[in-house]
């Protein structure tokens, strides 16, 4: 099979489109800074409400070669074997002391993604009124779960997804605890 000019152009266009869409995906994530409170509304995924939240695992580490932070999606997200986790545990069990120290630097974290409507972004007001993606960890997940099926469910429940006047805002409060941000003071209001 020989490749034609139109086939090559199609391939080139598809790659360019993939490249552009991957750039916009990162730009769509709401960036938060310590010392600020962001007001958002959670958006349900209308086509398939079961897919409102995307739950995933990732590995992250500072590269020993460049010093840059690097992350990789864990295949455990999709219920598959994870070669990064397997190699890390193998090294921790049987590796040299130097290898064990390097393996300890690889951290696995649990995260979620949800679409949000930005009511107030104090750092980037140009985000106000736009749809973004909130990437969050266990602290915010616990607050959301409490509003859905925990102690606060009687007060909030389905209202956390209601964009109308009966809906509630989610106030994402970013504070500093040690060297890391904490979100424990975030709440629905």
Predicted features, each with a name:
Residues 1-160:
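OB-fold ssDNA-binding interfaces and closely related basic DNA-contact patches used
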Residues 135-139, 173-189:
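OB-fold/S1-family single-stranded nucleic acid-binding modules
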